[in-house]
Amino acid sequence: MVNLDLDQFQEQTVLLKKEFRDKHPKFENRFKWLEEKLTEQIEVIEEQNSLGKSTIPELDFHHFENGNVDEGVIKQIKKSGSVVIRNVFPRERAEAWFQSLEDYVQENDYFSKQKEGLDRYFSDLKSDRPQIYGIYWSKAQIEARQDEAMAKTRSFLNRLWDFESNGQKYFHPDRECTYADRIRMREPGDQSLGLSPHMDAGSVERWLDPAYERTYSKIFETEWEKYNPYSGAFRYEAEGIDSPAVCRAFRTWQGWTALSSQGPGDGTLQLIPCIDTIAYILMRPMLEDVPDEVLCGAEPGRAQAVTAEWHSLLLRGLVSIPRVEPGDTVWWHSDVVHGVEDIHQGSQMSSVIY
């Protein structure tokens, strides 16, 4: 486990930057090249979004269940680091889960209970107070996690990664531990959720943890075009800083199941559907305009914030997911920037099982 106090974190950051700049004296020229390449990708996202089109790939569950997934779609998923997989569960079943969760919240008098850890963790990410419920083991959640359709979905996604090499298996793509997470139930008109853009799976760890250093070695060597974001090597060894609401387990993909109809404007998920943004985020602190002790949105025990101050180019590519229906699922790579719309302008509850 990484145990850093703020002073140690700052000292290590200063040393890290000095060593990097000494090793790569022409780094800023290389960074300009990276910026140009990312600008091209971001402009495509902007253009498609202005036309009402999404660059987040979509796939029907029954296609990969029957082995009928076009290689072009696979390429799009890996390039964007995200995908909407439709019809994983029947609509009526997802709607029944939603009703059972509403009943569960009332029967357990949820609103009178203390909900501490999440609020502290998201203290720099929220506009006000998240409407994400600290409920993990309801019947609906357990059924969704253990369903055969979910197992097939996760297996398909896991197999997009390089999970073994030279006889070493980094993880088993068809076998997972049960991962318990929360639920979202957001009422129409709500303006309090507003999770600003961020990445999970650590913040300062991405620069200072030895396993992450090996994971991102090509990026830190400024050979960004050689970096493989789907390599399972080393990433599973990364250790997270202790925090009340941080998942320290290795996750190939993060995701949720829709329990209600929701789309742009409905207070739902936003993504930057571009897997290459991780190189920009890791390299941005190395530029001379950043104070030596600053890692551009990274603080111990917090999610990695992506802000207008340091990442304005990337935020141009932040888009809402396409409309999804109950039973659809949405997935994104652990290095993909994501957030939640500030305002729910829709007419019905926006609800998901994480």
Segments from the language model and where they lie:
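Generic beta-strand/beta-sheet core signal
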Residues: 258, 272, 332-333, 354
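Non-heme Fe(II) oxygenase catalytic core, chiefly the N-lobe of the double-stranded beta-helix
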Residues: 3, 72, 77-80, 89-310, ...
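Conserved metal-binding segment of the jelly-roll/cupin
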Residues: 324-338
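Ligand-binding pocket scaffold of soluble enzyme catalytic domains
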Residues: 283, 334, 340, 353
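Fe(II)/2-oxoglutarate
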Residues: 1-79
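Short acidic/polar active-site loop segments enriched in Thr and Asp
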Residues: 83
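Aromatic sugar-binding interfaces of carbohydrate-active proteins
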Residues: 346-354
